[in-house]
């Protein structure tokens, strides 16, 4: 399956997005398609053996939309959109000027024939030139059975124009004495086009700000780089020509061009673009550097490792693009409403016309006509369509700036329903760098010989702590017989036979199967170690525990504060660990979690999460290691810490580039703020249409004698969609 994002131009409202989505998903070979109205893009997953980009383009072309299938250079698409925006601004300016002229003519009595003819000509010019896009797209939508905003504009303006033209012709050729010049609505048709175009210009400007975070990420990609040749000469070449293995030079205060490893030099790097952390990171020989991050005051030579689309920055940009194009589950309801919105509005307009005409034969048909046109003008599927995607774009973009990488909109919505947070201890609550604090020998025999045997066994182990134990022992294994048999049990320990003697290293239950009951000395060392919060591993042979190994991981300085904030949000925070009860309880009490679950083996983590879900809980799992991947995949919301493995990050719905748990609290704040903004936007969009459409139909006329002017309706329609975009932009401040 191919996953690809395409620019989709010509979208005007929620109905446009809904119908184009349906057309794309109906194309053979397409597994899924999402259309983002705010970013004017579509993200399609399709089988390239059954479907081609040309087929996708043809699927939406029939409805008047332009799907760009060529691969644009960086910034090329932005230039194209700016060009279209300038063309839209020119049309808007002309439409507004002509509308003002006509409005003055129509409002300055008496309404003479020359004024009417001038108004008709100016209205025709505006509709044919400035409003041509609405008519072309509206006609195509009508033919394709995919009614959208363009169709509403086409119907309302053409009906008003033709109606006015009819009365003008009647006055000229049939009954000049009938004074029908007072039944002309050229200004309504003109002002409708002007208001809609003006609204589109303002929306485009506001929507550009919703994607500002993504543009800042893209701006972190330098265009050129300094290559250091074997001869010592330095040349400048485009970043696109850099290959892995090349030696590059980073001058002071210069952006790193690709991911790589420092060969020589010392400096600091500002990695806030990648991690969200403002503190500069020291860079020396062997340190990793990342594309888009800023070198400090020192010069560095580094070897290119990941280039082009493989860099961390490029992966982040792709992730953000995909996430911003994704649909929240609530958007599916909006899409269903959008598909029937325009046909329902047209039906309401027709009913309005006939109800007025039948109930008030004297002047009802005239009032009915005005009310029907006003209904067509004031109805706004745009606000409905922009409510969710603009909020998501702002939220996900803001998160990316802070090092919170959200894979899709579902993650934001899932965060709003989570009630239980499961934290893996190692690497999440703690630093993830356990060290051997002490080795308490319990044997009366020479410890050195056993130390070399323990070192020989640990050298063959794949456990992350094996190296730390070998370093803590500080003995040479030369001259020690190779273990004749060796095996490891995940989550329990290892067993090996040296010189015919069987040894075990690991958890108490595993070791006691060989050693029997612990001696008083071993039990005392074990209890003291666990009370201090250390993880204890036992080393034993048949019938005897030889040593107790105390291993401890430093608790992160901010863990307790972050957990307190998370609990204040109403979350139950559970710490999951493979440590024994005493050690686990000591860490849990230190950071203030709601509940501690100890002695959990790696393969049991997913089952524990599933058990919570069976209790009716919505679970978020936070982890950083390979052994967390299954639990992350099982959780309702999966979150990988920045220090974690690639597998954990691939599995997770959210990746925190920082290893600080306070980033987790920031994510939940971001998610809740984004969801609140979506609900506010949808509430406003729905309330606007529920109130505006009946008022436009004339429901207040029997009580107040007031009938809404079509020009005022156009202004309200413009403000409704603009208010939704503005509210989404303001949410960026609330997310800080």
Describe every region a protein language model picked out.
Residues 108-112, 143, 162, 398, ...:
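Membrane-embedded alpha-helical bundles of multi-pass transporters
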Residues 177, 190-252, 283, 406, ...:
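Juxtamembrane coupling segments of multi-pass membrane pumps/enzymes
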Residues 28-50, 54, 183-186, 215-310, ...:
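Conserved cytosolic catalytic loops of P-type ATPases
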Residues 1-2, 18, 406, 500, ...:
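Conserved ATP-binding TGD loop and adjacent catalytic N/P-domain core of P-type ATPases
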Residues 293, 419-462, 492-574, 653-654, ...:
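ATP-driven catalytic headpiece of P-type ATPases
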Residues 274, 333, 370, 380-457, ...:
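Conserved catalytic phosphorylation-site environment of P-type ATPases
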Residues 1-116, 207, 216, 233-236, ...:
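Flexible metal-binding regulatory segments at protein termini and peripheral loops
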Residues 87-224, 336, 343-344, 368, ...:
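Transmembrane helix-loop-helix hairpins at the membrane interface
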